[in-house]
């Protein structure tokens, strides 16, 4: 997508700003001229139209033959000014802009925009509306009533519209607010009975339907309507000046909001004369329109090629995109009486054919751009769909079917209007590309009908051949169709279970995952085929691979091909700040989880995504005492996990399973490929038994021998006086109570929180100290006197809890201060010990107050909730520079589907880390917004690094 970034400064006087808004249909990657860094503007972003003041306060069309460009100020990135091609954006009205802007995920925003009916219904949702709310993905929807409608924050030119909903019935207690947002009471309800959501999480409950998701009439509906008076693909003429021009009908329907005006017709002209891009009032009505050759006119201005053209017999209303809105379906479309026919079952092959969501009888097919559905394949695989036409599979058009009167009622709606052919390559050869396993949630262009999302329905577990979602399948044709099953279910109005396949090759007339106006999955355009499940067979080309024996081997199957990640030989340091952010955030980012791997995925992400503290582990040459698979493990970690993660932001489950298999080679280690494990088990096996890493920590207890370990588990009794402890306090308490000291300053310190198992936590919240001062925990290190700041000579453990002297701090004193402190009657019996100091300590350092501090920085936090590990990592210096990672954030398919990892920014964490401990203690955990609750309440391991020490280790 061509675009230009003019500046990153505040847009002020050089531009007029008009209240016109556009949605980006393509992603922009543009260069910031100041920093020379790429700025990513994803598709689905919303921009406000701007005009150079020197041009004037209006839009000026480009010269003929040149591409029109539009200047936009991106609302989510208000300092960026883009100039984009007009074809890469779609204009949206301000009311739609407000509804869409509240949806922060640009892909979900674009998906909702394409569902025109649902978006329009969003305008009807107001205070008092009964709704259902989707609180969490994959869970049931809760009933509620809208109590607030409006912006939460009004800091932009236009603000997103949010809905404050009071949850009812089983939803009570499932919310997170009582109507208060950032200290402001926006509505009132009981505690934890309210939520603030955008339209994408909302569904309007109406008396006459099942909500926003049921706005399209399906084939099971008994309502009958009169079809549009002009056939799609019929030939027509129109007067242009003194001449007559011809074209093909690509749209015939009423316009939304203008139903009283009657039908309008979109005509694809034979000659390049046109003025319509397929949109009306910001809504896409026709995907095949081209502004250079398409016109939109009232039906009275259109001359059919045959003025006496017979009207089609009435049939079930498979409503087109213009008919889908209930409001429009009743205008100018009288009901037609008559019996409806049930397609029934047939012994021979038949096809449904749908265009723009409507069932259409056979007709001349000039442009193969239509979704289609194979109703049935003959039980004998040798019998082909070609029974319907001897020319099937060739480019010539099929013979004209018999008239409607000659068809039986069961066959009336089943015809073959085009030749099914695979799309040729540019060189004329047939395309045989590898399986397309795309799982992107939206298409890059607005080239599909705005469709309703698929209604929830139970998926079939498979058929007699053991096929299920994710299986490689074929439809026995000549030539066969190969693909991956993406969906199994029973659409409304059909008695058979269908399979939705994503085909290997493009096929004329296939969709991008929609069937009869409903989206069941998403793939590239012209690759979605819907066929009866019983007509599918396992892919004969890979018979030896089916079925996959178990979950351990599944991630090495061909079905995982679309999720593979790269191999990178070159050593790669972590990318930080904005550069790292651009690489890492989004869906299918991070490390893909599979089969109880979250403990390992999250630990690796914490250790390597944005830290190089342990990079020496990846570089040490093999020694004679190393295990035989040392090099294999190290190379796998370096080239297939760490380097790809840092460059591309993604590692697939196949690579992680290879590592899990290696872990099981260790004697006394088992279950790493299948069972739930804890991070400490993984670290001990990897670091101690396989890589033989020099222990990260060397700790001495009361003059005993130094003990080596790779992480430190905090053991202590609960202090009832402390509400929210910091990591600094916990570590010092634990060391004081156990009389421990670090024998060496660590370069990487992994601290395990005081909790027992996955469930019992000693503290409800723990404050993750961003900086850890370990000076007082080190042996042979100069330390400051707690009283005067001079060189400390003695340490007293019994003074630790004394409230009169820096309560809760380790106490060390110079000789003079120690004498004075222990003259107090309460401290006369204290036993204090000399502080161990370096033998060659320069005398002038401490006399001039130059006693250095050893500090470590927090770089990651590993969390667990209900046996599932997730990670928080810090990608920059700012307190809000936090990312949240979940290796199993989403799912593609059912039991044998695939997990989709996701990395999301969570800047709200920074705000909570600025709060005082008292405020955090008094804050109800359920009121903590976003991901921050998991960081503060579910911490399992906190990881610190020393920027200076890591240079030497």
Curated annotation (Swiss-Prot):
GO MF term list: cysteine-type deubiquitinase activity; K48-linked deubiquitinase activity; K63-linked deubiquitinase activity; Met1-linked polyubiquitin deubiquitinase activity; proline-rich region binding; protein kinase binding; zinc ion binding
Region (Interaction with IKBKG/NEMO): 467-681
Binding site for Zn(2+) 1: 785, 788, 814, 817
Key word Protease present: yes
E.C. no: 3.4.19.12
Region (Disordered): 318-350, 387-410
Highest taxon above the source species: Eukaryota
Keywords recorded for this protein, A-Z: Cell membrane, Cell projection, Cytoplasm, Cytoskeleton, Hydrolase, Immunity, Innate immunity, Membrane, Metal-binding, Microtubule, Phosphoprotein, Protease, Repeat, Thiol protease, Ubl conjugation, Ubl conjugation pathway, Wnt signaling pathway, Zinc
Biased amino acid composition, Polar residues: 327-346
Binding partners and assembly: Interacts (via CAP-Gly domain) with IKBKG/NEMO (via proline-rich C-terminal region). Interacts with TRAF2 and TRIP. Interacts with PLK1, DVL1, DVL3, MAVS, TBK1, IKKE and RIGI. Interacts (via CAP-Gly domain) with microtubules. Interacts with HDAC6 and BCL3. Interacts with MAP3K7. Identified in a complex with TRAF6 and SQSTM1. Interacts with OPTN and SQSTM1. Interacts with CEP350. Interacts with RNF31; the interaction is indirect and is mediated via SPATA2.
Record-given protein name: Ubiquitin carboxyl-terminal hydrolase CYLD
């Amino acid at each position: 997508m061509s675009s230009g970034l003019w500046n990153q400064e505040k847009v002020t006087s050089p531009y007029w700003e008009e209240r016109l808004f556009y949605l980006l249909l393509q992603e922009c990657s543009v260069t910031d001229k100041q920093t020379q860094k790429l700025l990513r503007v994803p598709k689905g972003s919303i921009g406000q139209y701007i005009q150079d003041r020197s041009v004037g306060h209006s839009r000026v069309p480009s010269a003929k033959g040149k591409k029109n460009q539009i200047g936009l100020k991106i609302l989510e990135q208000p300092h960026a000014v883009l100039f984009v091609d007009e074809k890469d954006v779609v204009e949206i009205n301000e009311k739609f802009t407000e509804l869409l802007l509240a949806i922060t995920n640009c892909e979900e925003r674009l998906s909702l925009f394409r569902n025109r009916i649902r978006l329009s219904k969003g305008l009807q949702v107001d205070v008092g509306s009964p709704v259902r709310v989707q609180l969490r993905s994959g869970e049931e929807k809760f009933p509620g009533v809208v109590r607030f409608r409006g912006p939460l924050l009004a800091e932009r030119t236009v603000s997103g519209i949010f809905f404050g909903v009071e949850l009812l019935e089983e939803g009570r207690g499932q919310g997170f607010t009582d109507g208060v947002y950032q200290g402001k009471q926006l509505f009132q309800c009981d505690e934890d009975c309210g939520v603030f959501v955008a339209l994408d999480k909302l569904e309007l409950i109406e008396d006459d339907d099942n909500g926003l998701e049921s706005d399209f009439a399906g084939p099971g509906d008994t309502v009958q309507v009169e079809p549009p008076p002009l056939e799609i693909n019929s030939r027509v003429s129109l007067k242009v000046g003194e001449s007559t021009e011809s074209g093909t009908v690509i749209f015939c329907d009423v316009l939304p909001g203008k139903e009283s005006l009657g039908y309008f017709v979109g005509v694809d002209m034979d000659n390049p004369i046109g003025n319509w891009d397929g949109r009306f009032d910001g809504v896409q009505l026709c995907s095949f329109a081209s502004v250079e050759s398409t016109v939109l006119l009232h039906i009275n201005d259109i001359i059919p090629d045959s003025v006496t053209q017979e009207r089609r017999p009435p049939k079930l209303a498979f409503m087109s995109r213009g008919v889908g809105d209930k409001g429009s379906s009743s205008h100018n479309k009288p009901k037609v009486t008559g019996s409806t026919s049930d397609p029934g079952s047939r012994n021979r092959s038949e096809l449904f054919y749908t265009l723009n969501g409507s069932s259409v009888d056979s007709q001349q097919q000039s442009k193969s751009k239509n979704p289609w559905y194979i109703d049935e394949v003959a039980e004998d695989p040798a019998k082909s769909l070609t029974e319907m036409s001897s020319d099937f599979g060739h480019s010539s058009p099929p013979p004209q079917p018999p008239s409607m009167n000659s068809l039986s009622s069961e066959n009336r709606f089943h015809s073959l209007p085009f030749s099914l052919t695979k799309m040729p390559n540019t060189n004329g050869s047939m395309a045989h590309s590898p399986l397309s396993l795309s799982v992107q949630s939206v298409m890059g262009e607005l080239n599909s009908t705005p469709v309703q999302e698929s209604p929830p329905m139970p998926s079939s577990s498979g058929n007699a051949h053991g096929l299920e979602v994710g299986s490689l399948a074929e439809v026995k044709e000549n030539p066969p169709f190969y693909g991956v099953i993406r969906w199994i279910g029973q659409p409304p109005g059909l008695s058979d279970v269908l399979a939705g396949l994503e085909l290997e090759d493009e096929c004329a007339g296939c969709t991008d995952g929609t069937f009869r106006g409903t989206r069941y999955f998403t793939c590239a355009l012209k690759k979605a085929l819907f066929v009866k499940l019983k007509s599918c067979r396992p892919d004969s080309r890979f018979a030896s691979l089916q079925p996959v024996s178990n979950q351990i081997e599944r991630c090495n199957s061909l079905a995982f091909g679309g999720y593979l990640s790269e191999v990178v030989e070159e050593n790669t340091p972590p990318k930080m700040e904005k550069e790292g952010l651009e690489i890492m955030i989004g869906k299918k980012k991070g490390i893909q989880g599979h089969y109880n791997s979250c403990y390992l995925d999250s630990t690796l992400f914490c250790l390597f995504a944005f830290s190089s503290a342990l990079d020496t582990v990846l570089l040490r040459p093999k020694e004679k005492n190393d295990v035989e698979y040392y090099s294999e493990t190290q190379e796998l970690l370096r080239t297939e996990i760490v380097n790809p993660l840092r460059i591309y932001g993604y590692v697939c489950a196949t690579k992680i399973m290879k590592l899990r298999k290696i872990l099981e080679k260790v004697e006394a280690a088992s279950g790493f490929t299948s069972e739930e494990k804890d991070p400490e088990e993984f670290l001990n096996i990897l670091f101690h038994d396989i890589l033989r890493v020099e222990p990260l920590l060397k700790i001495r207890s009361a003059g005993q021998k130094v003990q080596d370990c790779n992480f430190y588990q905090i053991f202590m009794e609960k202090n009832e006086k402390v509400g929210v402890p910091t990591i600094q306090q916990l570590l010092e308490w634990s060391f004081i109570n156990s009389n421990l000291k670090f024998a060496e300053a660590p370069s990487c310190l992994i601290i395990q929180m005081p909790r027992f198992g996955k469930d019992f936590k000693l503290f409800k919240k723990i404050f993750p100290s961003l900086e850890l001062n370990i000076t007082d925990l080190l042996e042979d290190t100069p330390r400051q006197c707690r009283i005067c700041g001079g060189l400390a000579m003695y340490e007293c453990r019994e003074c630790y809890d004394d409230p009169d002297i820096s309560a809760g701090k380790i106490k060390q004193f110079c000789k003079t201060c120690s004498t004075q402190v222990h003259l107090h009657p309460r401290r006369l019996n204290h036993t204090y010990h000399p502080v161990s100091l370096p033998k060659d300590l320069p005398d002038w350092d401490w006399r001039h107050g130059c006693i250095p501090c050893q500090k470590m920085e927090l770089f990651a936090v590993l969390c667990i909730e209900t046996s599932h590990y997730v990670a928080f990592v810090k990608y920059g210096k700012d307190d809000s520079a936090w990312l949240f990672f979940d290796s199993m954030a989403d799912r593609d398919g059912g039991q044998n589907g695939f997990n989709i990892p996701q990395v999301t920014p969570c800047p709200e964490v920074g705000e909570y880390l600025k709060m005082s401990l008292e405020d955090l203690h008094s804050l109800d955990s359920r009121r903590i917004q976003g991901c921050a609750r998991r960081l503060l309440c579910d911490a399992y391991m906190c990881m610190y690094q020393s920027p200076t020490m890591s240079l030497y280790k």
